[in-house]
Swiss-Prot record:
It comes from Rhodopseudomonas palustris (strain BisB18). GO terms for molecular function: rRNA binding; structural constituent of ribosome; tRNA binding. This is Large ribosomal subunit protein uL1. The gene is rplA. PANTHER family: 54S RIBOSOMAL PROTEIN L1, MITOCHONDRIAL, LARGE RIBOSOMAL SUBUNIT PROTEIN UL1M. Pfam families: Ribosomal_L1.
């Protein structure tokens, strides 16, 4: 079936104007995730912020109670004992100057990046490469740290970084279509709670304005925010 026809069929039964309770929305999304691969379940949260203003930036990290269903490759910039600690914790790529050179050369063999504080002057050279990919280590989200073991295990165990985009939207994958409905609900509530707690001082009016969930190839289903936050 062509993608257009499949999406049209998947949209049947979804009222695009209605706000559904979270459990109902998840059920509908799962029922419409009919691709041959295990689709990612995604959430989009529209926030009442303007990220062009520094006091309205929203970002953070949260460990989902049921993981993401995705295997992340973790890269760590560290030397000596901290490099050994990273390897022992399960990091996929560990290095210092050598790793910086590889990244500068266009070879990025990781999905999440962690660094010890002493490495940041070196890692800072990679801003133009890692920044646009949302991979630049940042102490605010725990990816610049001396606690390498917990940072690596957190990244491997289902932690999700979130950051508001220019349009005021936070988007994240919160599991797979193969997950049980209850597990997806728990993950969404954990993420939304973290986003809520990250509300910036400069935010005015209604903070969480609209929420929608979808699968990789399926239609978006709007969610009643109160059914998540309540």
């Amino acid at each position: 079936m062509a993608i257009g026809k499949r999406l049209k069929k998947a949209r049947e039964g979804v009222d695009r104007e209605k706000l559904y309770p979270l459990a109902d929305a998840i059920k509908m999304v799962k029922e419409r995730a009919v691709s041959k691969f295990d689709e990612t379940i995604e959430i989009a949260i529209n926030l009442g912020v303007d990220p062009r203003h520094a006091d309205q930036m929203v970002r953070g990290v949260v460990t989902l109670p049921n993981g993401t269903g995705r295997t992340l490759r973790v890269g760590v910039f560290a030397r000596g004992a901290k490099a050994d600690e990273a390897r022992a914790a399960g990091a996929d790529v560990v290095g210092a100057e050598d790793l910086v050179e590889k990244v500068q050369g266009g070879t990025i063999e990781f999905d999440r990046c962690i660094a010890t504080p002493d490495m940041m002057p070196l890692v800072g050279r990679l801003g133009k490469v890692l920044g646009p990919r949302g991979m630049m280590p940042n102490p605010k989200i725990g990816t610049v740290t001396m606690d390498i073991t917990n940072a690596v295990k957190g990244a491997k165990g289902g932690s999700v970084e979130f950051r508001v985009e220019k349009a005021g939207i936070v988007q994240a994958g919160i599991g797979k279509a193969s997950f049980g409905e209850d597990k997806l609900v728990e993950n969404i509530k954990a993420l939304t709670d973290a986003v809520s707690k990250a509300k910036p001082a400069g935010a005015k009016g209604t903070y969480i304005q609209r929420v929608a969930v979808s699968s990789t190839m399926g239609p978006g289903v709007k969610v009643e925010p109160g059914s998540i936050l309540g």
